[in-house]
Amino acid sequence: MLRVDDLSVRYGKKLVIDHVSAGFKPGRIYGLVAPNGCGKSTLLRAMAGTGNGRAEGAVSVDAGDCMGIEARRRVFYAPGEGTLLYPGLTAADHLKMARGLWASDVDLARVAAECRVDGFGRKRVRSFSQGMKQQLTLAVAYATGARYLLLDEPMNALDPTNVAVQGELIRKAAAEGGCVVLSSHILGNVDELCDTVLFLKDGKLLRYSGEPRSAGELYRKLFG
């Protein structure tokens, strides 16, 4: 399990994440929902140990400290908008680098084919459309073999075909014993994919546990 206990994150004097505690179990898909600027990316980065705010509290991976290299390799944070990628490297370069840094044994040809990046594996990122960058970012996440995938707006810039493809790959990752935490503004995808939906409001995580409702309905109730 990936756990956060009493986690707070500040940027200067601004408290963005306010004493959050939660557990994320393998085999499940979690949705993280909030308006822009409410701290979704900040929380995901803090969970992966890659944030640049001032963090307090604890993050643990499978009951161990998250600071060791082996624990860190079990978690991967994939930011949106292609910011993970290097313009001068090819798609194939990125996949090889991810597998090497995370010491995984993932079949890169399979990942490239599943994520539909095999057709532009030798092209450099600087020539990619935004949708191609997003496809590659997600392929990089799978190439790491990390158990816990933290995906920040993973469906942004994808066309409907690739949204469906990534939905199936996210389900597959969970079915094979992984855990996926995804932030999204596409609330229909949240309803379709996620076992649990968490809302971030005023720095606090809220988990809905009443009768089944759509993420959109709950969003309107919480945020207007």
Regions inferred by a protein language model and the residue ranges of each:
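H-loop/switch region of ABC-family ATPase nucleotide-binding domains
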Residues: 183-185
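Catalytic Walker B motif of ABC-type/P-loop ATPase nucleotide-binding domains
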Residues: 149-153
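Conserved ABC transporter NBD signature motif
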Residues: 49, 53-71, 207
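Conserved ABC ATPase "signature" region
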Residues: 96, 105-121
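Conserved structural motif at the start of ABC-family nucleotide-binding domains
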Residues: 2, 17-18
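Q-loop/switch helix immediately C-terminal to the Walker
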Residues: 87-101
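The feature captures the beta-strand-to-loop junction immediately N-terminal to the Walker
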Residues: 33-35
